[in-house]
Amino acid sequence: IYEPDPEPGRATLTGEPSLGTRCGYRKRGSSSGGFSKYAMALESWNEFNEDVDIKPLGFSAEGDWILNSRFTFDQSLMRNPFLYALSNQIDRWAVKTQFIEIFHDATGGDITASDYFGVYTFMEKIEPDKGRLDIPSVNAWDNSEPDVTGGYVFKRDRSGVGEQSLNAAGSGGAVPLTSPNIISTPQRDYIQGYLAEMNSALNAPNGISSTGKHFSEYMDVGAWIDNFWLNILAMDPDWGRLSQYFYKERNGPVSAGPIWDYDRTMGSDDSRDDNPRQWDTGNPTWYASNYPWFGKLFGFKSNNQPTPAASSTRPDVMQQVVDRWFELRAAEFGQSNMETIINGMADEIREAQARSFARWRNPAPGSISGQNFSEAGTTGWERDVSHLKGWLKARSEWIDQQFFLPPTFNKNGGVVEEGFQLTMNSNDATVYYMTDGSDPRAPGGGTAIGAIPFDVGPIDEVLLAADSSCQYFVPLDASLQTTWFLPEFEDTDWFSGTSGLGFESLNGPLNSHITTNIKTTIMPSAT
């Protein structure tokens, strides 16, 4: 491995390499292994052909690596690295990547210019490790709790060479186990039993299995939602049924992820992802019988795509799905951030891509299979990069339009000047708000008690004089709940006092601000 010299920013093949190692490699990829420019799995070896850890290109020490190629479908050369970077930005671990150029002598002899193999992505494998997917490994002797509970890595995919499969209830198909490599009978019984209970909870109308546990105790719902949106943003034709990873931490729930394999997405040359302004890619988005866990979690038994938020039988989960989309759109999924990632990657390979495409032209860069979203006047590889950015813009804006847009404020919090009036844009929908910090949406999707409908204009704020009279009550249980919010609530039996109202000890620092001290009301024996 030759790394660029920091000063000129270039690597030269006449000096000493940054790292040299023996290694073994094999072609990889269930559908791409037969390409002329093939991907490779790499193992670093010592002189005895034993695995040895190396630290190349600033990565953590490990012995298993991937040289990921792009021969067709992704002419930008960056769809995988882009989405992995986006996933890491939202704190969902994905493999780290680095663009490289390869000389590959597959026949023996001296390395010459004819051995140039083009631009590749050097990347990690998905495996438990402190420098990678940071969950404990399951060892052969981990056959009782808590050690038997994790970590496991499995996927919905075709089975790979030497991989064992789990009998996972409700998965819709094969579930190869990628870690541990060899599983004991107690370990298999544990993880299959856990997944069966999870599926039972998903099938139950109330979300509770026969064990009394809710599906949210079996699944990291937030991780499943983030994995869903990464896949749906990319419009992955294979998501959920191929290259769909899951992992279970020790004493923890099942998470969806890490994400994997996105060369046939985001307006690639695959054609199934040409149109960013639709949900489905030939495979359903919201429910599919061959990958039903996501659909069941979101409250679907069929692919109710026209109005998914309204069709769900789990409106609270679907509200989390919608809220998370707009949260991501305001930050990492914003067009500016996505283009910053793409532009940075494009700068890295702008010179190298020309050499790579001179070696491999299948198809030639700039040949877009569907609708063109690139800027006018761009050509070749620059057109592919521009198309990727334009496609993502069209995709994310279309998804925005499938849900009620959240209200916007003339200021999103912080210090304001005296006299400031808060206004809110309700986007032609009825918006409710609360003034006590609670959610105006009740569980199940109704309007919470005390929620105030917003009328266009400033929100009035009522200020009370410092010495206003007040009434107060110290509850002994939760029977009041929120009934005291209601205008008709009867409070004549409450104590009377003068504000400020507070709780403070005899010589406490807030005594000068408190006129009615309720400490002895709450704690009769207090002084």
What are the roles of these predicted feature ranges?
Residues 1-82:
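Conserved NTP-binding catalytic cores of kinases and kinase-like/nucleotidyltransferase enzymes
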Residues 42, 217-275:
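Active-site acidic catalytic loop and adjacent metal/ATP-binding pocket
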Residues 53-56, 69-70, 122-234, 285:
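ATP-dependent phospho-/nucleotidyl transfer catalytic cores
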Residues 88-103, 236:
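Short, well-structured beta-strand/strand-turn elements
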Residues 192, 199, 251-403:
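C-terminal catalytic region of ATP-dependent kinase domains
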Residues 371-468:
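Short, compositionally stereotyped local motifs that mark structural "simplifiers"
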Residues 455-509:
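Accessory carbohydrate-binding/adhesion or oligomerization-edge regions at the termini
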Residues 523-527:
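Short beta-strands within extracellular/lumenal beta-sheet-rich domains
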